[in-house]
């Protein structure tokens, strides 16, 4: 049985989402404008009728499809029933939504409907991009008379599987309020528009990797045979083939204003690469993944430096993580550390093949420089000061490297259903007397590998 009935096609649903969302945004901006200029308050009756609400998307399947697809990880139902969520920024997510809805529509004959929801758009999310000018004295009034962000309504219960069942099952991991919250944070932390983020994401904890990414990105933009057309940089720089001295333009200090600056190597079809310098520590790693997950990237990879834990390793060797020892503690409440974080075969293979491709060496020679094993992620930057306890734990786990971000990023990928992987470079060997010293960074960088990860996703 096909239950499409009088429902919408994916294209019709997306158009209606666009129209309803834009209608609410315009109404909210107009009401704010009137309040600023004349003190006029929004009409309470109109608000109750949905003047400022998000649109909602509902997909229903009656369970009658014969032999539904079971192997793919997305675009499928687990049981019959109705699934719903609220939607924000439908234009930004159009390609993603179209892919998902098309699979459900074609393979299951799903019934798709769009209507106004009961959840209002918080006013801070419509200010950006408008011509509205606010000062601090207006903040209290706006918060009193207009919908605002209520943290009690924002959470990851759905993604963490602890939501309370209702008549409708959740259609997405994140509803509109959670998405808007993260989109605002992404712009704040990275210094770039959310529209510029690409689906293939690199995280790093080393500034020099940014330098290499920028250098390589600029060369790609100048190559007429390359699919890359622009480089968006933290701080507002926009680099194209017409930009004079692009690397000099990027070298200003604008990116330093942001906690986790990002650079986006953009393609015309939106299949480019984003690099985020997340700095040091599991807190930053958790934070950026919490927010970036709402964009549903195709993959995120950690490329950074680490401490080598084995005598057989040398500075400049590579570490491909196939397991993680989670001593970061930032996710223990939502993903206990005894839950294993498996490596993803396709990602592991791609990283290994990229290492062979760029090095130009056969597999046996690559294995002399590329160590596969367990990576420890700690929240203690001075773990060396607890040598006895640390050394025992490393031996029990057979760990080969230690850092402060990789396991957190992998755990967040597992938690939010984003493919993940880790390729690190050994920068020091504290357990064997080769500690990190001033000036050693130049030596490490000389044998480093940023260019190895780019063919993996380019």
Locations of the language-model features?
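N-terminal short beta-loop-beta anion/metal-coordinating cradle
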Residues: 9-277
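Flexible, glycine/proline-enriched loop segments at strand-loop-helix junctions
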Residues: 199, 274-280, 333-343, 397-400
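Mid-sequence, gly/pro-rich, charge-dense loop/helix-turn segments that line enzyme active sites
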Residues: 229-239, 308-386
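Non-transmembrane, aqueous-exposed alpha-helical and coiled segments at domain scale
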Residues: 258-260, 290-293
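Alpha-helix C-terminal capping segments
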Residues: 291-296, 310-314, 411-419
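Active-site-adjacent substrate-binding region
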Residues: 346-443
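Conserved small/polar residues in nucleotide/adenosyl-binding loops
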Residues: 450-456
């Amino acid at each position: 049985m096909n239950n499409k009935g009088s429902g919408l096609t994916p294209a019709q649903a997306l158009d209606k989402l666009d129209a309803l969302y834009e209608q609410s945004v315009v109404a909210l901006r107009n009401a704010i404008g009137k309040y600023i200029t004349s003190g006029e308050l929004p009409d309470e009756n109109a608000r109750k009728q949905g003047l400022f609400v998000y649109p909602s998307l509902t997909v229903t399947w009656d369970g009658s499809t014969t032999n539904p697809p079971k192997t793919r990880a997305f675009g499928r139902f687990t049981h019959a029933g109705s699934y719903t969520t609220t939607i924000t920024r439908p234009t930004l997510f159009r390609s993603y939504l179209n892919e998902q809805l098309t699979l459900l529509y074609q393979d299951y004959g799903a019934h798709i409907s769009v209507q106004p929801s009961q959840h209002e758009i918080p006013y801070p999310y419509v200010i950006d991009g408008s011509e509205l000018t606010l000062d601090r004295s207006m903040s209290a009034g706006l918060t009193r008379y207009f919908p605002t962000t209520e943290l009690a309504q924002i959470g990851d219960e759905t993604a963490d599987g602890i939501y309370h069942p209702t008549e409708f099952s959740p259609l997405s991991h994140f509803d509109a309020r959670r998405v808007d919250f993260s989109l605002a944070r992404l712009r704040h932390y990275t210094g770039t528009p959310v529209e510029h983020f690409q689906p293939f994401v690199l995280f790093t904890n080393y500034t020099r990797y940014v330098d290499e990414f920028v250098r390589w990105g600029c060369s790609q933009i100048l190559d007429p045979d390359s699919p890359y057309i622009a480089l968006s940089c933290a701080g507002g720089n926009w680099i194209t083939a017409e930009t004079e001295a692009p690397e000099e333009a990027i070298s200003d200090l604008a990116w330093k204003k942001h906690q986790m600056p990002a650079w986006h190597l953009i393609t015309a079809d939106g299949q480019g690469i984003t690099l985020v310098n997340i700095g040091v520590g599991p807190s930053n790693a958790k934070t950026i993944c919490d927010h970036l997950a709402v964009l549903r990237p195709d993959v995120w990879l950690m490329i950074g430096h680490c401490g080598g834990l084995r005598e057989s390793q040398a500075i400049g060797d590579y570490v491909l993580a196939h397991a993680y020892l989670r001593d970061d503690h930032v996710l223990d409440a939502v993903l206990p550390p005894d839950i294993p974080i498996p490596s993803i075969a396709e990602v592991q293979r791609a990283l290994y093949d990229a290492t062979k491709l760029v090095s130009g060496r056969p597999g046996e020679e690559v294995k002399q420089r590329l160590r596969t094993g367990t990576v420890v992620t700690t929240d203690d930057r001075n773990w060396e000061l607890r040598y006895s306890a640390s050394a025992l734990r490393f031996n029990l786990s057979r760990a080969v490297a230690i850092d402060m971000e990789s396991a957190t990023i992998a755990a967040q990928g597992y938690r939010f259903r984003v493919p993940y992987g880790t390729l690190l470079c050994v920068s020091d060997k504290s357990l064997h007397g080769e500690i990190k010293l001033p000036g050693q960074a130049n030596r490490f960088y000389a044998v480093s590998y940023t260019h190895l990860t780019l063919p993996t996703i380019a």
